[in-house]
Curated annotation (Swiss-Prot):
Forms a ternary complex with MCM helicase and DNA. Component of the archaeal exosome complex. It catalyses: ssDNA + n NTP = ssDNA/pppN(pN)n-1 hybrid + (n-1) diphosphate. It comes from the Archaea. This is DNA primase DnaG. It comes from Caldivirga maquilingensis (strain ATCC 700844 / DSM 13496 / JCM 10307 / IC-167). Its EC number is 2.7.7.101. Mg(2+) 2 binds at D222, D224.
Length: 452
């Protein structure tokens, strides 16, 4: 269905069945011709459209053998009494062309109530934002009490028993801090996805290293020399995505809610932080990472005598950092047998270029500004077309999905949901905060395709 008039108050939905094969113009023509003058000139459909009190009538048609069924949508800016009269009048249409027909009202939606619901939901989100960043004077008096209460929410995580918040496992993003006191302070101010690196000897705990490989991680350290040293050790062994620092001379455990929010808001990508280091420090970090990567992919020592090898020795590809400028893997995109358009991904392939059917490219050109999403299977057949806001819920109900094209910003949460459903391609308006993506998934923007 197309876009509705912004000022419409109500939306009339009618279902219809015609005992013959007809098209949209036949349906609309019947509605106008058979209702003309029924309720007088003031409630004539054509006159109401001319004065913008009835919006553009939309029709969905489906042919089933020698019958035609579908739905009619009529946006109304009349009051609810007049809208009900118009709906009842439309039900009197009993012929379309030479065929018998039946129209019946399915629903009359109050579009303003939908808008009121959106306003209330948004207000709830804004209240949470205010409560997080604004500290009333009365709350200052209870800081000590709240701190003691919140300590009860600290859990032991991993085999090392690291101090952590209760949401570390369930959250997509994890904040890594230095000690237990830092964890307590962040939990007190509403940040429950936090873990400390203390409590384990021999350097950075393995639990933290493993978490950094499968989640988006923010290293949040003190604003002193000690915090700087811990941060560099962390970068040598862990896959950190962002860096946040306490104000100079302050420790994370001392920060107020406003200071914590500001520090996390001003976080920088790890690449930007590394570029600020001296050449020697950069080389040390890069060399440490190379050694770790080599150790992960290096096979165990070969036996002295030849051993038979299995037919396939490829390990499962690990989740890796998204690289926007280069990609060495070869990606094969299923295409229809006719009408194909070559496009180049944002990750340049060194061996072949993915292809998309022209029908998909046409849809991408039309999607901009609609806030809609289309889910395709491997044959590029449309499985679902839904509003972007319903995309995550719809994904849980769809099977055999291969690709999603949507007018929106890609997030890590969407990537994770797509991975869970075996989806291999995402095409979006813009790439947002996506830190990690499987090596067998292709991520494109509309510009990657439209500008080719």
């Amino acid at each position: 269905m197309g876009a509705l008039t912004i000022s419409a108050k109500y939306l009339i939905e009618l279902g219809f069945e015609v005992q013959g094969t007809v098209d949209k113009p036949d349906i609309i023509g019947a509605l106008f011709s058979q209702t003309e003058g029924l309720l007088g000139s003031d409630l004539d459909l054509r006159e109401l459209q001319n004065t913008s009190r009835i919006g553009r009538i939309e029709v969905e048609v489906e042919h089933r053998g020698d019958k035609t069924v579908g739905k009619v949508y009529v946006p109304s800016n009349l009051d609810h009494y007049e809208t009900a009269l118009i709906a009842a009048m439309l039900e009197t249409v009993d012929r379309v062309g030479p065929y018998n027909a039946k129209f019946q009202v399915n629903s009359i939606k109050d579009l303003r109530s939908e808008k009121r619901k959106l306003i209330i939901d948004r207000a709830k989100e804004l209240i949470k934002l205010i409560e997080r960043e604004t500290i009333p004077d009365t709350k200052e008096l209870m800081d000590k009490f709240l701190g003691e209460v919140k300590q009860g929410e600290v859990v032991s995580y991993g085999p090392e028993g690291l101090p952590a918040g209760p949401d570390v496992e369930s959250s997509d993003t994890v904040i890594i801090v230095e000690g237990r006191a830092d964890v307590v302070n962040l939990i007190k101010h509403g940040y429950r996805n936090v873990i400390a690196i203390e409590g384990a000897s021999g350097g950075i705990p393995k639990t933290v290293i493993e978490l950094s490989r499968r989640k988006t991680t923010i290293a949040f350290t003190d604003g002193d020399r000690g915090g700087e040293m811990i941060l560099r050790e962390l970068l040598k062994v862990a896959d950190i995505d962002y860096i946040a620092r306490a104000p100079p001379g302050k420790e994370v455990e001392q920060l107020t809610a406003k200071e914590i929010a500001k520090a996390l808001r001003n976080k920088i990508p790890v690449e930007e932080y590394i570029n600020q280091l001296s050449k020697k420090d950069r080389q040390i970090i890069e060399e440490s990472k190379k050694q770790i990567e080599q150790a992960q992919v290096q096979p165990s020592a070969a036996p002295t005598s030849p051993q038979p090898q299995p037919e396939s020795t490829q390990p499962t590809q690990p989740i890796q950092q998204v690289q926007v400028t280069q990609q060495t893997q070869v990606i094969e995109v299923p295409a229809q047998t006719q009408g194909q358009v070559q496009v180049t991904t944002m990750q340049q392939s060194t061996q072949q270029t993915p292809q998309l059917p022209t029908s998909v490219v046409d849809e991408i050109n039309k999607l901009s500004g609609t806030l809609e999403a289309i889910i395709y299977d491997k044959n590029w057949t449309v499985l679902k077309r839904v509003p972007v806001r319903d995309l995550l819920d719809t994904l849980q109900q769809v099977n055999d999905a291969y690709a999603i094209v949507f007018d929106g910003v890609g997030t890590q949460r969407l990537v994770d949901a797509a991975v869970g459903k075996g989806i291999k391609m995402l095409i979006m308006t813009r790439i947002g905060n996506i830190a990690k993506v499987p090596s067998d998934m292709v991520i494109l923007t509309f510009n990657d395709i439209i500008n080719k």
